[in-house]
A protein has these predicted regions:
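Mono-ADP-ribosyltransferase
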Residues: 1-196
């Protein structure tokens, strides 16, 4: 999709529903322009498009609820559906993570959802980190410790590989990644998973 058409779709979505957030459309556009000026080598190397970068920033800045809902259900506004398409494309282009263990969160805080199952299909995009300290001071949410598949089979992509401060990487698993539950700690709400 051409970037101007993508932005028109974003604007129409904002008018239907405050979707991208009050004033955020300009912020995301500015983020894309800054990224283009500072990382043209990355854009060229991975053939990234402006709509893909726009959605990447939406996902990284935690304005992704409707994108995640659309990713898991297939239902959503035309803009949400386009965002899912663009983010799928983005993930298909960016590097696979070479880390073996990741740390993620399920904000639902419902560890009992995992008690009677051995595997599950995570329909949304799972955002994770290579840094365990994301668990520090966490009061709510189920904590995931994720063991990755072999590097040639994993669906874990590095989504901020150009800016890994302190060797910390932000990872995103493709939607519909399947996981096996290895260990469940109901008291501390920690689930150890293996990507299947």
């Amino acid at each position: 999709m051409v970037y101007n058409d993508f932005l028109k779709l974003a604007k129409s979505s904002i008018q239907e529903r405050i979707y991208v957030g009050e004033g955020s459309l300009d912020t995301y556009r500015e983020n894309v322009e800054t990224f283009k000026s500072e990382h043209s080598d990355i854009i060229e190397k991975y053939s990234l498009t402006e709509p893909e970068l726009f959605v990447m920033f939406m996902m990284l800045i935690n304005n992704s609820d409707e994108i995640q809902q659309c990713a898991s259900s297939g239902n959503g506004t035309p803009f949400a559906k386009e965002c899912v398409r663009q983010y799928d494309s983005f993930l298909s282009k960016v590097p696979i993570s070479d880390n073996a263990i990741f740390y993620g969160l399920d904000p639902s805080d419902r560890v009992e959802n995992y008690v009677n199952i051995s595997t599950f299909n995570y329909k949304r995009y799972m955002i994770a980190s290579t840094r365990q300290s994301i668990f520090d001071n966490l009061k709510n949410g189920v904590k995931y410790i994720i063991n990755k598949r072999r590097i040639d089979k994993t669906k874990a992509h590095e989504v901020m590989w150009w800016n890994d401060a302190n060797n910390t990487k932000t990872i995103c698993f493709e939607r519909n990644t399947k996981f096996e539950i290895n260990r469940l700690d109901r008291i501390n709400k920690i689930i150890e998973l293996t990507e299947l």
